């Protein structure tokens, strides 16, 4: 164990690591685990064996159990009430959430909207550190997780540009695209098509990192008198229903 305990009422800059006798360095969340670890090791000479990730993200999205439980409960109610309609996710990434849609409703159409290339530095207003996020995916990675990939309709590109020729009703939708424009466009596109008893999940509503998600939701709900229900997952997702 370290011999010195330092009580400090503020935030220490990373360069102070060299001056501190410590046992472990704990990365609170895994969002930037690779980047932080790289800086600690290569810039500040930290022994990688002393780096611990408090909330490792090594098993898909199991750290968001509340969101998954809510999805299962909503699907259970939909089946009990025989709620019919297609399904969609905007912002699929590697398909961890969308695969649950396909697992519980393998016979229904599932539209998958994503660039499958991460953020665009010119088009998407994101922090520079986010530019390389979400690039480690592909259509094959997503479809290989699906119980019935034949009912998955992939729309590669920018939403809502890729939402052409879709006229059916929707029962279950997930919006997980982190940015103001696609979140607002997703609500504007899917809410009128949402059947009574259907649900729209919006991720990152309470995220401090993607604050424009909340802005887009409030703007849409204010214009349409839509009601939201908050979840207790780590990013404070919300559900919109009719």
Which stretches of residues belong to each language-model region?
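A solvent-exposed beta-alpha-beta segment
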Residues: 1-31
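S-adenosylmethionine/decaboxylated-SAM
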Residues: 53-65, 72, 81-242
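Gly/Ser/Thr-rich loops at beta-strand to alpha-helix junctions
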Residues: 31-32, 94
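Structural/interface elements that position substrates and couple domains in central-metabolism enzymes
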Residues: 35-43, 155
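Short, charged/polar "capping" segments at the starts of alpha-helices
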Residues: 2-7, 32-37, 121, 210
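Pre-Walker A adenine-sensing motif
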Residues: 74-76
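Structural alpha-beta junctions
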Residues: 5, 41-52, 224-225
